[in-house]
UniProtKB/Swiss-Prot annotation:
High-level lineage: Eukaryota, Fungi, Dikarya, Ascomycota, Pezizomycotina
Cited InterPro entries: Cyt_P450, Cyt_P450_E_grp-I, Cyt_P450_sf, Cytochrome_P450_monoxygenase
Binding site for heme: C448
Reported cofactor(s): heme
Stated name of the protein: Cytochrome P450 monooxygenase vrtK
Source organism per UniProt: Penicillium aethiopicum
Amino acid sequence: MAFSTYLGSLESSLVLKGLAGVWLVWYIGRVFYNIFLHPLANVPGPLLCKFSKIPWDYWQWTGRLPQNTAKVHAKYGEIVRIGPNELSFTNNAAWNDIFAKVPGRAQWPRHPKRVPQGKNGPQSIMNTAGTYHARFRRLLNHAFSEKGLQEQQDLITKYIDIFVSKVDGFARTGQSLDVTKWFVMVGFDVISDLGWSEPFNCVENGEVHEWMKTFAETAFDTQLKFLFRERGLMFLAPYLVPMKLQLARLNNFKYARARVEERIKTGGTRGDFWDKISVKSAGDNASGEGLTKEEMVVAAVTLVGTGSHTISTLLTGLAYFLGTNPHTMKKLVDEIRTSFNSPEEIDLVSVHKLKYLTACLNETMRLYPPVINMLWRTPPQGGGHASGIFIPEGTGCNMSFFGIAQNPDYFTRPLDFCPERFLPDPPAEFRDDNHEAYHPFSLGAYNCLGQNLANAESRLIMTKLLWYFDFELDGTVDKDWLDQKSYGVFIKKELPVKFHPGPNAVRHVANGNGVATNGHANGHANGHARINTK
């Protein structure tokens, strides 16, 4: 009996060892194939990245993928292999070959496993393609066009003026305010009113709405689930992704659903972004030209998230760079204060003449892009060519914004904040900079729909702030402030800033042009702010 038990145990041991041996041979063969025989074998990159996704997964999990990818580019060149089936690019040719819309050429689709998914599966403008994507764009194109935004100028200006009056209160008392939080609140108030004619009054109340608090954690949750989805392990996500992140995502969709359900009841007569969606989507999209209710929920999440955080990232980054570059700050302040004689002259059209402000915003996006690591594409069926190499179907392809920005072959003094490089007639030092490598809102049919809103709102906010106030960074600002984690978007650190009344603020107070002490700008009816006199 004992002998037969021993034989059974021996047989089990041999089976396990045999299986382990088979797996080891298979794994060694796979490693050998990925390094030496794979279609991407000749693309340079770290050895471990050629046969394992462990580095990529770790960088993604820790929020350091953009920074580490840039380091790989600095060492290995413009085209690098950062995973067995993942490539990253920093050259002009890749923008044209992968992202540009060229007649007669198949569009490179978004990578199916690296795009956000709705809670219940519906697609959003972030992850659609072809006619499906075109349907989303048609519904929102006019709203986000320059003409559409000008039609909403009074509404946009109203919330910016409330913010200006709040800043005045801080300036008069010498208190610092965290512009990271306040810029998000301004963007959130604007997009909520544009989207649903239902403002959250975050700036007026000085409080972050609960919905806003879910976005950073939702971004983290989304990026982590990419890792599980790619490996067919989504069934493990509920157990391994922190519950705090999962609850944030659920709450994000809960708030969106509540807004959508309320907005459906009012129909398409409110004059906001949602009017056209409401009309075309009647009867749960019976016409096929609108959105189903579930698609509306996903669209609402996308609209609010990108409409507030994209703008706040751009403005917060610019505030940091201005605060750490006094010479640039002075040049921008001089441009703004010599361009306008009164606040009534500052509007969505007039701010476009500010060349140096435009250059400052472009330089901010070069060094601190509002959206990062969200451009994954994959070749069309049968594979495709990009940057002179054949890329097999199923390969993940991305542009490294940091790799582009930090490349001295593209930009002179690449790590320095130099807005002059983006002036229409730049100094000789910057005339050889490669602006064709710079596309912060992506390129082609899937470029960022909200870029006009981000540019317009950012210009208007910064112009009004610097027309009235001087500012400086609080002494408590982290010297490594730019070193931030990112999960599709940056997880921004606090940026405390001290504002001081400038000459225009003092002059307006002396002339009695003030705002009410409750923080409402007297000029709301015509869209212009007044400084508080009390």
